[in-house]
Design a protein with these regions (language model features):
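A compositional/biophysical signature of low hydrophobicity enriched in polar/charged and small residues
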Residues: 1-77
């Protein structure tokens, strides 16, 4: 299982709407609003790195109102 945090910037005034929409996507375990450089943080799980990449492009970035994403895969040291 691969886990990642996805930091999201949204269009002005759309952060809550984006977080609600993303929270409904299968594979998302957390979607919360932030204050600062990013508007939403998402925790997502996938079966592989490739699946995670497809998930971000096909599911997360397809949500209206998103202007930029930064995906941070979790590593276990």
């Amino acid at each position: 299982m691969v886990t990642a945090y996805i930091l999201i910037q949204t269009e002005v005034g759309r952060a809550a709407e984006v977080a609600r929409a993303i929270s409904q996507i299968q594979g998302v375990t957390l979607a919360e609003n932030l204050i600062g450089a990013y508007d939403v943080i998402v925790r997502a799980e996938a079966n592989s790195d490739d699946e995670l990449g497809r998930f971000v492009v096909a599911s997360v970035q397809a949500v209206p109102g998103i202007t930029r994403t930064l995906t941070c895969p979790v590593i276990h040291l």
